[in-house]
């Protein structure tokens, strides 16, 4: 009778790449079906109707479409106010995707977002499976691909899905480069990642911090301090071309030298003596009398908010705590806080359906609902940090992968502390947070024993 070790050798190796591809394509096909069955409707801009077809409206959907409409009407240098109040990057992406005509633009957008998300999830899982984290790769893949909020966001109008895919793609390429250690390919990976981080910043400027720190971490470890620092500088300069183009657009359009003029307003909502850190309560902000152009007023308001935080450390810490809770809060229930009312998942969520009756609403928003919500919030954070700690305790590559994920997660979280607490801001880093939670969950189910495999990968 064959021994256990011999039977293991005779057992065919599982083709994870094929399995990942099968599921990624299956989900993509299902999304295509959903996209082409979404009922068309009209919204109105400046007294004229605008057709919305093949997409759901995200939290700021109307504003993005208003910017897109301005670009269609007046071109890239449109003076439409929303294009300089908010970053014009996402409406410009929409304009680029309107090559089949404006009528098909939204359908093209959601197909593009869905395809990118499936590919990013697939590539991330494939690269993970080449490391000692192979046994975690399938669970992480399933948790990311089938998370209803994250996966359905690719069918909604909003930057969140593309930026979440961006973090997965850049992480996958970094892992691929570290494994291959091929200097000839490094320049290609550097260029691709720089463009991806640039496009992410193009749509949401605050993500540049995570991009810069991730790039430095990767290249310093890959090439050492001197060469790594030089390559990092080159990569960052490439990434900055994209937000710089928004400054150029705004200057040509309305004479404003800024990416957007809403930062101060957003920060002011989350600060002040009567602020809660979120969108609830009074929005009186901090004492400030800005003067000058809209861009100058925005800069002055940012300074006022920062000065208030420095002058009120106790109140600031309380607001930072509140914003952290809001950032990690559930999508629905008594603890939720943010702008995810249009989350597609909420239209079919059984918890939401329970609230249609008085008894169900009392259950969800009562004591039991609060306990469940807090367990969901704290449990998710516990799994995330446990997953990160599990990777930190491993050898170089696994620790490095954990650091790459945590850099993206922590920078996005910390930046929200000086702006406003909103669980929607969690979406861009949700793929990586689900990865760490998958590591934490599987390790926990194994009684705390990491599920590492031996491989000839980097040591």
Predicted features and spans:
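Multi-pass, polyprenyl lipid-linked donor-dependent membrane glycosyltransferases
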Residues: 109-116, 142-174, 200-210, 425-430
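Membrane-interface transmembrane helices that cradle and orient dolichyl/undecaprenyl
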Residues: 132-134, 170-192, 200, 218-224
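Transmembrane-helix motifs of polytopic, lipid-linked glycan transferases
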Residues: 108-132, 169-173, 382-388
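Membrane-interface anchor segments at the N-terminal boundary of transmembrane helices
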Residues: 104-108, 323-405
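Membrane-interface alpha helices of multi-pass inner-membrane proteins
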Residues: 141, 188-204, 215-216, 235-241, ...
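Loop-to-helix entry region of an early transmembrane alpha helix in multi-pass inner-membrane enzymes
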Residues: 83-84, 88-95, 100-119, 153, ...
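Membrane-proximal lumenal/periplasmic loop motifs of glycosylation machinery
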Residues: 47-62, 72-95, 99, 107
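Membrane-proximal stem/loop segments at transmembrane-domain junctions that anchor or position
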Residues: 251-351
């Amino acid at each position: 009778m064959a021994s256990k070790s011999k039977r293991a050798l005779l057992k065919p190796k599982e083709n994870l790449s094929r399995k990942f591809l099968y599921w990624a394509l299956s989900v993509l096909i299902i999304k295509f079906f959903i996209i082409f069955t979404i009922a068309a409707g009209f919204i109105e801009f400046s007294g004229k109707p605008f057709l919305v077809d093949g997409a759901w409206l995200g939290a700021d959907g109307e504003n993005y479409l208003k910017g897109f409409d301005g670009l269609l009407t007046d071109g890239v240098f449109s003076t439409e106010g929303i294009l300089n109040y908010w970053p014009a990057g996402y409406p410009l992406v929409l304009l680029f995707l309107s090559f089949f005509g404006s009528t098909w633009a939204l359908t093209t957008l959601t197909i593009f977002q869905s395809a990118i998300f499936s590919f990013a999830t697939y590539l991330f899982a494939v690269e993970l499976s080449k490391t000692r984290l192979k046994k975690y790769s399938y669970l992480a893949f399933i948790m990311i691909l089938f998370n209803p909020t994250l996966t359905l966001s690719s069918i909604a109008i909003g930057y969140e899905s593309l930026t979440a895919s961006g973090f997965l793609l850049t992480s996958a390429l970094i892992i691929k480069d570290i494994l291959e250690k091929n200097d000839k390919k490094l320049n290609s990976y550097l260029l691709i990642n720089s463009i991806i981080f640039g496009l992410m910043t193009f749509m949401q400027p605050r993500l540049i911090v995570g991009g810069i720190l991730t790039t430095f971490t990767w290249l310093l470890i890959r090439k050492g301090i001197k060469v790594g620092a030089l390559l990092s500088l080159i990569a960052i300069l490439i990434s900055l071309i994209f937000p710089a183009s928004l400054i150029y657009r705004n200057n040509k359009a309305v004479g404003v030298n800024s990416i957007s003029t809403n930062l101060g307003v957003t920060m002011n909502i989350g600060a002040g003596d009567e602020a809660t850190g979120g969108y609830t309560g009074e929005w009186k902000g901090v004492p400030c009398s800005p003067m000058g152009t809209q861009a100058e007023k925005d800069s002055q308001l940012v300074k006022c908010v920062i000065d208030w935080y420095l002058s009120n450390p106790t109140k600031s810490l309380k607001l930072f705590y509140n914003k952290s809770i809001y950032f990690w809060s559930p999508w629905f229930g008594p603890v939720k806080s943010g702008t995810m009312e249009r989350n597609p998942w909420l239209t079919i969520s059984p918890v939401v359906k329970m609230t249609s009756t008085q008894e169900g609403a009392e259950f969800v928003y009562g004591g039991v609902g609060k306990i469940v919500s807090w367990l969901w919030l704290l449990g998710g954070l516990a799994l995330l940090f446990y997953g990160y700690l599990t990777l930190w305790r491993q050898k170089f590559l696994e620790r490095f992968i954990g650091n790459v994920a945590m850099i993206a997660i922590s920078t996005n979280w910390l930046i929200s502390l000086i702006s406003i607490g909103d669980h929607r801001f969690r979406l861009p880093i949700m793929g990586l947070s689900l990865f760490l939670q998958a590591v934490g969950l599987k390790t926990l189910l194994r009684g705390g024993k990491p599920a590492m495999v031996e491989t000839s990968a980097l040591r």
